[in-house]
Every structure is written in C-alpha cells, then in structure tokens.
Amino acid sequence: MVRLVHIVAGMAVAMCAVARAEIMPVDSVQVTLPDSDSVQVSAADRYVRLTERDYRRVADELGIEVATIKAVSDVEAGKSHIGFFEPGKPVINFDRAVFARRLRRAGINVTKARGSHPAAFAKIDVRKYGSYGKSQYARLESGAEISDVIAKESTFWGMFQIGGFNWRKCDVKSVDEFVELMSQSEAMQLELFARFIRSNGMVKYLKAKNWRAFARAYNGGSYAKKGYHRRLAAAYGKYSKQ
C-alpha cells in the first residue's frame, strides 16, 4: 500500500540546490491514504512496536508459526525484540571484518583507510560515545566517508540483523532503498525479513523446525560454533508455549 507522507510540523527543513537537504525532526506527519482521507500521526507512532497482528499476518503469508519468527528475532535482536536504537535509526551492527574485506574487493587500500578513518575500524567504545548504539553509528558514519555503499552493505540492520550486502535478496533496487525501508518501522523490518527468507529458500526450514539448516543458511558456516541452532530451538520452545 502506497502512502504519501507530507511534513506539516513547523520545524525547518534546510534545503540547498547543490547539497543534500538536511531534514530536521518533526512533531507529526500528515498521512494521506489512497481513499484521500488524511490522519495526523505523531513521529513516535511511526516507530510503534510490532503487534501480534503483525506477526500473525506475516506468519500466515509464509505458512509458518508466529513462534518461529519470534525465535529468530529473539536470537538476532535479543529478548527485547527492539528494532530501533532511536526513531529513524534501526539497531545496527557494523561489521569491521566485512567492511575491510569489501573494501579490498573494491580495490581500496585498507591500510590507508584505517589511518585516515580510524573510527570505522575501532572497537565499540561506550564510554566515548555514550551508548552501544551511538558507538555503532559512529563506526558506520566514519566508514561511509570512505565508501557510503560499502559501509551500508557491511552493516547488519534491524531486529532481524539482515546484512546490507543482501539488499538484492530483499526485493529492493539499491542498498540505499534497503536502508530507507529498514529505517521506517519495525513492521517494514519484518516485511524485509519475510522477503529475505523467501528469496533464499529458508521458509521450508522454519516450517520443518530444522534449526540447524536455518541457522546455517541465515548465519553462515560459523553458526554451530556460536550455537545459533540451539538458541533458535530454545527460543521457539519458549514462544510456542505462549
């Protein structure tokens, strides 16, 4: 469903013909629905938590149990199942190893990049940045100064921690569109998860509760070392009883 969003709050939007516009925070947005009705929606409401109805809708579309989706979220995002660090900023994990590998593949000198942008390769520093989330974004922003596309592709996004390098498997046209959708809502993060596992043939593993096969496909060859399959099974056992 396409929705047209117009900013109606009184805060300024600085625009320049030769530079990217900087969008300032707004108190509310006017949402125009296809039937031409308009409703006023607060900025906070745009990032409302996932509901049982959201889970049920996607589970029914995929032909799987709600508990299997919650199990994946539990393992990837933690028991809080939070998709956003703050409004407009999804929870992320900037992977330095993936970043360095993709830089080399693009012909970029990693040693020079590390010297000019040390923050992109630094360990998480909560004391310096104030929180885990801010520290992750500091690394992403520093990496983006080297290569915006590679930095986004080297980051795992949202409550299902989908790697940016998988954007093509999420039915989007670019990594920028992928990030834009990830930044919209937890419901959109769930939708991208559904697209991702459908395009990769992983739905059958969730249907069969084949946690080992799903963990291998979703998390890669190191899944066993980190016990992903056991954690998924345990999380499913918990949610299937609710």
Q: Across the structure, where does each feature detected by a protein language model lie?
A:
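Boundary at the C-terminal end of the N-terminal hydrophobic targeting segment
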Residues: 17-23
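Generic detector of low-complexity/intrinsically disordered segments
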Residues: 6, 17, 32-35
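Sec-dependent signal peptide recognition
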Residues: 2-10
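Repetitive helical segments and hydrophobic/amphipathic motifs
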Residues: 12-15
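Catalytic glycan-binding domains that act on GlcNAc-containing polysaccharides
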Residues: 23, 28, 35-242
